[in-house]
């Protein structure tokens, strides 16, 4: 389950792909166009888009860490939260869960001192431990692809830290004072494999540098009853009016300053009262804009799924190969925050999703579909791949064989010509084909292809030399 990147896909992407909404551009008080200060309005939407990742990460942090102890998907600051099993179809804690990797996540601050992450010998098992800054950029990725599977220890240092680390510890410098670890460990989901992964998870440790090599007991943590623990993160962010949003953004930028590359963009925002290191000045923001700025800005963000060149639309699949490191592409960074919070670098994982078949029609469990891979054309990865079935709200679908994902773990059967067919339908395709069956609901559904450690060269989804096949409706 991903408690990070798909916190708010619950609203559905199809309805969010429209152009700027009429309600936002006109509103209850008349049309927006033609009023004085329109230039400032669009500048404010730029600022909203720019800050969307930082505000969303903060709201996510508040929810995940608002717990007295590690339990389920929550745990205090500075403690690793390890999920111990895959969810079933009744799970409703977060959207778009997965059944390929078990997560180990943590939030901590590096403003006062570095934190040390210890990873045991993973015994050849695939894993990765991306480290994200407050702006959702992945600044380091220890893991199988980059550092191997042996025991390893890292110190995550803050932007202003300088000092000497103990021998054998590699430094990763975070650009911000807030750090988000999102560890993933491959697991087949069998009782034996669960036990093996649990033994590894129990050895993941993070401690302040001053306690490295010593016994460490995390400080007590209390629950803040004012934090909304039920409303999805994205919805909470989107509910803020512009003043509340910019006040929070200004406060966050004091501890997580923009990068040097952002300076020209950020300098523009002073005109509307947003200056790094200072409190937000709401007097510089037209009161008529306060409610409309978030509406229009979010529509601009979601429009990127259609118009941003980083977002690919191929054979009914939609995916982005410019994730994890965004530079100054603030719109792409914002849309990934909205629909894929915590996304990996493309070299580590790509997550194409599909709501429509090869003919452009919405998937419907009343029909039968086949995803056909020609011989030697299965997803080219060094890690693993899978296809997951979701209902329209991005939850698993109950089915008689309790299968929510299909991958080579099912010992897929090949056709006589060496090709492979995945059968996507509500009823069994027959016992001889059940190994290749991904059960669908009776109604609408969504598919997601996960590709971990995808090839970077031919054949590769990253450079376009490998193409995802369409999902075709069959008689």
Residue ranges and their predicted role:
Residues 17-23:
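Hydrophobic h-region of N-terminal signal peptides that target proteins for export
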Residues 28-475:
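A compositional/structural signature for long, glycine/proline-rich flexible linkers
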